[in-house]
Amino acid sequence: MMSKLGVLLTICLLLFPLTAVPLDGDQHADRPADRMQDISSEQHPLFDPVKRCCDWPCTIGCVPCCLP
């Protein structure tokens, strides 16, 4: 009985190797800074269309900043 289970386990591992299972480490990391570069500054909620720049804070990815 145990030898039959061993043979079955061996066949399963040969047919479906563990490397074929996707792991969490294989997924790309989420990069919010890269996503923010894809957004146009004119569509940013802090963009002032009259001044043609972004109000404070300037560290959230909206350029150009309105400097005083």
Curated annotation (Swiss-Prot):
Keywords: Cleavage on pair of basic residues, Disulfide bond, Hydroxylation, Neurotoxin, Secreted, Signal, Toxin. It holds the Pfam family Conotoxin. Transmembrane segments: none annotated. Disulfide bonds join C53-C66, C54-C62, C58-C65. Residues 21-50 form a propeptide. Residues 1-20 form the signal peptide. The keyword Secreted applies. It is found in: Secreted. InterPro entries: Conotoxin. Expressed by the venom duct. The modification 4-hydroxyproline is found at P64. The cysteine framework is III (CC-C-C-CC). Classified in the M-2 branch, since 2 residues stand between the fourth and the fifth cysteine residues. Belongs to the conotoxin M superfamily. This is Conotoxin TsMMSK-021. It comes from Conus tessulatus.
